[in-house]
Regions:
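Metalloprotease/metallohydrolase-associated module, dominated by Zn2+-dependent proteases
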Residues: 1-52, 69-106
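Active-site recognition of the HExxH zinc-binding catalytic motif
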Residues: 56-68
Length: 106
């Protein structure tokens, strides 16, 4: 498990989480809320977003990282959007499930 708060392990690869207002994405879209750089293993989240939106965007970008590390290089953005929105809601509706799994299932 990564020691630093801004590190996230995905399929054995360590991604760095960076929260900043400006980041250069592959298409330099200034309207992006987040971006997952697979080569550098960095997940960017736009700093000016609300805390709730940052969490939602993090789950979205983590979904991209998970699919990429699982070998899905071409990803359907609509599928990633739908899946990450639902997963974000599951986390909100079940706030203790992750805490439970960390302390009870280990």
């Amino acid at each position: 498990m990564p020691e630093a708060k801004n590190k996230i392990k995905v399929c054995g690869m360590t991604y760095t989480l960076k929260i900043q207002e400006h980041f250069k994405a592959y298409d330099d879209d200034r309207n992006l809320w987040g971006y997952c750089d697979y080569e550098q293993q960095i997940i960017y989240i736009r700093e000016s977003l609300s805390e709730q939106k940052k969490k939602q965007v993090l789950i979205h970008e983590l979904t991209h990282a998970i699919l990429h590390e699982a070998g899905y290089k071409e990803q359907d953005e609509d599928l990633v959007n739908r899946f990450s929105i639902i997963l974000h809601q599951v986390v909100i509706d079940n706030p203790n499930v992750l805490v439970f799994s960390l302390f009870v299932l280990n």
